[in-house]
Amino acid sequence: MIAVRPVTRSDAAEWMRLRRGLWPEEPEDDLDREVAEFFEGTLPEPEAVLLALEGGEAVGVVELAIRPTAEGCRTNRVAYVEAWYVAPGARRSGVGRALIDAAEAWGRSRGCEEIASDTEIANEASARAHRALGFEEAGVVRCFRKQLRSGKDAR
């Protein structure tokens, strides 16, 4: 049976393990700092973190926030899936659905009428999982950045 509940301080190590699975390229120090800041209440988002457990083992996580807007959404208060991860051994067993169902309930309880998410363009497995749970593709976005020069080099 899959249970989904809010993360607690005693879950910090399990949450970190799942975050490292989702973002293996991110420096562990950054991920650790974010978890610490979440429990201190100084991290602006996620606003909520829900952990999925199966047989007492943490097998998935969803990190949530409320955004004033999201691609393709019509309302000005959108529940947003900032992170969604299911451990490889627990995939295709209902864990992802249980997490999104809980995320939807969280959003509704906060007055949201829509829930949104994103994924990397090349992550087809994630896109399929989103579609299977009723998400509709709202657009494809490529993000760009440019370092700003200062002083006499600025133009």
PLM regions and their residue ranges:
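Conserved beta-strand in the GNAT
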Residues: 51, 57-66, 80, 85
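Conserved active-site alpha-helix within GNAT-family acetyltransferase domains
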Residues: 97, 109, 121-140
